[in-house]
């Protein structure tokens, strides 16, 4: 029996999201919270967590997964390398569902479809060795008519059109910026000119995926100039009479509510 007539989606900054479905289940996606300078919510402030879904092992996506699993005993869906890391850190292997592209899984009554993601995934294990694996994007079947695409740090590639044909995501997040506030965590020579997708590539990806609503992400500050550039490119595609999704720019802590009848309504934090 549904407890609500809407699906709620809240943005925590970078690529971290919370979905609360109509049954009241809380799903956390790439829960980078404690070390996220933009996140207004503490990982231990929830009354319950029903599922954590992790795209890959980067610190700003794996985030607080280990701490959440310890505190709430919630199941985790992730790739094999993330499972190996969590088990090495003492998380019960039986609470972790490893999967990869194509293997749709159901955990806690929630279906998740992993899809191809052009990126990498690597993590330092407790013993000092490194584990690598296959990064994932994924589609969360949150509610009837609500299929949430999480891009998982993917670069653009043409088979996003195939994913649209096969899975018909309705709403999704697309990374289009480099969060300047956390780049110091990975010191390297030179600079990153773009994130995994430039704003133009992100606009194309959103159009190719056939989304009804797109949430640009991978920023801490919604005033990031790359966010405005993404919006500009979406409008340019629309001016060419191409079907484009409605874009909603959220600041960390903001959420949207999707009524059971469809449509996306923005709410303030």
Tell where the protein language model's regions lie, with residue ranges.
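Beta-strand-turn-beta hairpins that frame and shape the catalytic cleft
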Residues: 2-7, 20-27, 104-113, 142-148, ...
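Metal-dependent catalytic neighborhoods of phosphoester/phosphodiester hydrolases
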Residues: 40, 63-72, 87-91, 224-233
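Active-site environment of divalent metal-dependent phosphoester hydrolases
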Residues: 35-36, 58-63, 83-86, 103-106, ...
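Zn-dependent metallo-beta-lactamase
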Residues: 1-26, 33-37, 115-118, 162, ...
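Pre-active-site segment of Zn-dependent metallo-hydrolases
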Residues: 18-58, 63-70, 78, 121-125, ...
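Active-site neighborhood of phospho(di)ester-bond hydrolases with catalytic His/Asp-centered motifs
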Residues: 28-31, 49-57, 77-80, 148-154, ...
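Active-site-proximal loop/helix segment associated with metal-binding centers of metalloenzymes
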Residues: 114-146, 154-159, 167, 171, ...
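Cap/insert and terminal regions of metallo-dependent hydrolase folds
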Residues: 155-254
């Amino acid at each position: 029996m549904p407890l609500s007539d809407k699906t709620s989606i809240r943005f925590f900054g970078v690529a971290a999201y919370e979905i609360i479905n109509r049954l009241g289940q809380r799903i956390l996606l790439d829960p980078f919270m404690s070390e996220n300078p933009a996140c207004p919510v503490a990982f231990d402030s929830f009354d319950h967590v029903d599922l954590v879904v992790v795209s890959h092992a980067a610190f700003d996506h794996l985030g607080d997964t280990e701490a959440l699993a310890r505190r709430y005993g919630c199941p985790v869906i992730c790739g094999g390398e993330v499972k190996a890391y969590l088990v090495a850190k003492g998380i019960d292997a039986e609470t972790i569902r490893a999967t990869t592209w194509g293997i749709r899984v159901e955990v806690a009554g929630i279906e998740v479809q992993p899809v191809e993601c052009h990126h990498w995934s690597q993590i330092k294990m407790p013993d000092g060795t490194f584990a690598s694996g296959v990064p994932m994007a994924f589609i969360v079947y949150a509610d009837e008519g609500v299929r949430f695409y999480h891009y998982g740090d993917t670069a653009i590639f043409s088979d996003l059109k195939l994913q649209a044909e096969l899975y018909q995501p309705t709403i999704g997040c697309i990374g289009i910026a480099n969060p300047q506030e956390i780049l110091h965590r990975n010191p390297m020579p030179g600079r990153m000119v773009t994130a995994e997708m430039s704003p133009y590539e992100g606009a194309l990806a959103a159009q190719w995926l056939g989304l009804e609503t797109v949430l640009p992400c991978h920023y801490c500050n919604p005033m990031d100039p790359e966010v405005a550039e993404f919006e500009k490119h979406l409008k340019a595609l629309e001016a060419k009479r191409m079907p484009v999704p409605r874009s909603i720019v959220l600041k960390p802590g903001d959420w949207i509510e999707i009524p059971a009848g469809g449509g996306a309504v923005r709410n303030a934090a």
